[in-house]
Each structure stands twice: as C-alpha cells, then as structure tokens.
Amino acid sequence: MSLDGKIGIVTGGTGGLGLEIARELARNGATVVITSRKQSKLQKACNLIGNNCYGFQLDVSKKKSLLNFAGSISKYFNNVDILINNAGFPFERKIWFKKVHNISEIELMNIIRVDLVGSFRITGEILKIMMKRRKGVIISISSTPAISGHNFGSPYSIAKAGLISLTKHIAIEYGQYNIRSFSVALGDIDTQAMRRSLSKKEILKAKNENTMKRLGRPEEIAKSIVSLAGENFSFLTGNTIIIDGGKVII
C-alpha cells in the first residue's frame, strides 16, 4: 500500500498507539502531522517518525487551540487526506473504577470534552478542508466498551460510543464528497500507559478476556488502522472495525 503524497494528521501522536500509527503512516509514504498538548514531546516524536513529520501543539478540549491549529494546517498544507482522532483523556484509576452513581458531572465532562467533543470539533474543521478537495478519510479511535459496555469506566464508554455515532454521520453527510469514515473499536493494547495504569494481575485478567489470550501489539493495531486509509477499502465507509482479539464475542 502506498500513501505517497498523502497528508495525515494524528492527534495525540507523540506516544503509545498514536505514535505507532504516525510511524506506520510515514512508512507508507505519507507526510505526517502529529499533535500534543505538550510542545516538548513533539520534536522527539518527529525524530522517531522521520523526515516527513511536523508537530503542532494542540489541546483538543480548548476551542481557541483547535481554531489556531486548523488555521496553521490551512496555511502550511494544501490539503488533508487522513485524520486520525486518537487524542484521549489520560487514564485515572479513581474515575475508572467508580460506578455511575458516584461519578461527578465534572469527572464525566472532563472525559467527554476530550474524547468526544474535541474529536467532533477537529473533525468539523478538517472536513472543511477535505470538502474542497472532495476526498479524505477520517478514522476515530473508539473502544470495545462502547459496544459491549463494561463493569467500570462509564464516562469513557459513553464518549467512545459517541465517536461511533459520529462516524456514521460523517459517512452519511459527506459521502457525496468522497469522504470516508471509520471508527475502530479496540480491545486491550500493550502500551506503556496501560502497564503504568494496571497491576500485573489486572493485565493478566485483560489477556484472558479475549480468545487469543494476549494483549494487542501497537504495531499490529497501527497496520490495521492505516490500511483503512488506503485505496483497498475505497467503497467501505461508516463502519466500526473491531480489533480486540475476539473480546466482544465471549
């Protein structure tokens, strides 16, 4: 698959799965734009990605930051071919393990503001660019709890379910512009963030919750996600692709 000449944006692209997606885009020939709330992380990540990488500071939860970013993209690039909505609210145990009746409105909205509203806003800005070129692919990183529910983490599940709905709306509203959209519902992925957040016992439990009895590897997940941006799936849109090692079927 070749993405030569394509420009791809990965929000939250300086670490974990986001960085691996950005690297996979670059390996396939794309020029990559990564974003992070922290300026200090951008250059280090671009060094890992390669020459065709540009870093922009962006806080998707802040409207002014989003508008400044969109203005910079319009100024420095003629088009955007691929948008990966990957930025997410950091995992917090004290919120994740709360039941619905114990979650405050502030805790709920902090997660929704980043995971859903931020992705919604940046998608709207990038759609304006894609519509002019009459082409583009938008991929939003969702999660299996958005489909199956979970014992914990209801704000996260709600936000990720919203991305699945957004994906369908993009497909219906913008298919006439040759703009395709996907959401990717991920299972448990072996990232540094996961290993920092969960105990060894919790990680073992996560492995046993899918049919393959292991965690997903960031590099294999990135390959699957990036393949959706190519021409092999040119008549596929509005779908949620489940990549979870068979978690939701057991």
Task: Spell out what each predicted region is.
Residues T123, A159, T167:
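Active-site helix of classical SDR
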Residues D81, H101-F120, K135, I139, ...:
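Catalytic Tyr-X3-Lys loop
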Residues S143:
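Residue(s) in the substrate-gating loop at a strand-loop-helix junction
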Residues I7, T14-G15:
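Conserved glycine-rich cofactor-binding loop
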Residues V226, T237-I250:
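Short C-terminal tail/terminal secondary-structure segment
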